């Protein structure tokens, strides 16, 4: 079998291209798609720990720390000491971070619709179901 026909290759390659496309759309706003995904999670649920954010985004803690450092430097989030556990910090979205997330969300929806328009609705739903099944399986193989 040719490597380009491997499911892993196709998934990774497609995911990378989608990430690059979204990052290109976000470039005028000074944020990458990876940074935006974390910022968006925080706008949905503010004041969570880095550890909890890492679990919810399924990103490793080192990667989350790097992304949060970038978001904090840009003034889009704040880290405050957790009064319940002094070893951890709670992450808060600043007003400018919340504004940016709300500005970018329609762009993400537009890109999603653009991609979903390539296939009939039934195929999109089947694809999502299949990808969730694979993702759950991979979660259980750790």
What are these regions (language model features)?
Residues 1-29:
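N-terminal leader segment of winged-helix/HTH proteins
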Residues 12, 40-44, 105:
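Short, locally clustered residues in the helix-turn-helix/winged-helix DNA-binding domain
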Residues 17, 21, 37-40, 99:
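Pre-recognition alpha-helix immediately N-terminal to the DNA-recognition helix
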Residues 19, 69-129:
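Charged, amphipathic alpha-helical coiled-coil/dimerization segments
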Residues 45-49:
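Short capping segments at the starts of secondary-structure elements
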Residues 50-51, 62, 69, 89:
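Residues within helix-turn-helix
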Residues 54:
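The alpha-helix within a helix-turn-helix
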Residues 122-142:
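C-terminal regulatory/oligomerization modules of transcriptional regulators
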């Amino acid at each position: 079998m040719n490597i380009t026909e491997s499911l892993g290759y196709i998934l990774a390659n497609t995911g990378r291209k989608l990430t690059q496309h979204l990052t290109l759309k976000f470039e005028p706003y000074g944020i990458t798609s990876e940074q935006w995904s974390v910022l968006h999670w925080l706008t949905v649920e503010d004041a969570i720990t880095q550890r909890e954010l890492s679990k919810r985004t399924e990103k490793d803690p080192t990667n989350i720390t790097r992304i949060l450092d970038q978001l904090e430097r840009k003034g889009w989030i704040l880290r405050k000491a957790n009064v319940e556990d002094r070893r951890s910090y709670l992450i808060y979205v600043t007003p400018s971070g919340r504004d940016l997330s709300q500005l970018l969300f329609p762009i993400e929806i537009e890109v999603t619709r653009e991609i979903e328009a390539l296939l009939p609705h039934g195929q999109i739903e089947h694809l999502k179901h299949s990808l969730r099944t694979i993702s759950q399986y991979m979660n259980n193989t750790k």
